[in-house]
């Protein structure tokens, strides 16, 4: 006997009770993933990344982004805008002492 009714889309009735597999949730939902950190490290020339480094890299990246965005927000509010533009980010990086060429 056919478990799937005629014209029905999706899975059969027999497969409805099967548990679905879920990805493991990380403790920091807004953190950078380990593979992403490895890719960035590879671009910088690093061959291996120690296990204890990931948390520190996440903290440093979060602080760097927070500082950059807070300065960019100051530029946007001074210009009476609610949207942060690319030039706001470039000015905030310049204020932090980082020269970014290409934009």
From Swiss-Prot:
Its main location: nucleus. Glutarylation at Lys-94 (H4K91glu) destabilizes nucleosomes by promoting dissociation of the H2A-H2B dimers from nucleosomes. It holds the Pfam family CBFD_NFYB_HMF. Residues 20-24 bind DNA. Residues 1-32 are annotated as: Disordered. The modification N6-methyllysine is found at residue 16. GO terms for cellular component: nucleosome; nucleus. The modification N6-glutaryllysine is found at residue 94. It is found in: Nucleus; Chromosome. It comes from the Eukaryota. Keywords: Acetylation, Chromosome, DNA-binding, Methylation, Nucleosome core, Nucleus. Residues 10-25 have a biased composition (Basic residues). The nucleosome is a histone octamer containing two molecules each of H2A, H2B, H3 and H4 assembled in one H3-H4 heterotetramer and two H2A-H2B heterodimers. The octamer wraps approximately 147 bp of DNA. Core component of nucleosome. Nucleosomes wrap and compact DNA into chromatin, limiting DNA accessibility to the cellular machineries which require DNA as a template. Histones thereby play a central role in transcription regulation, DNA repair, DNA replication and chromosomal stability. DNA accessibility is regulated via a complex set of post-translational modifications of histones, also called histone code, and nucleosome remodeling. This is Histone H4.
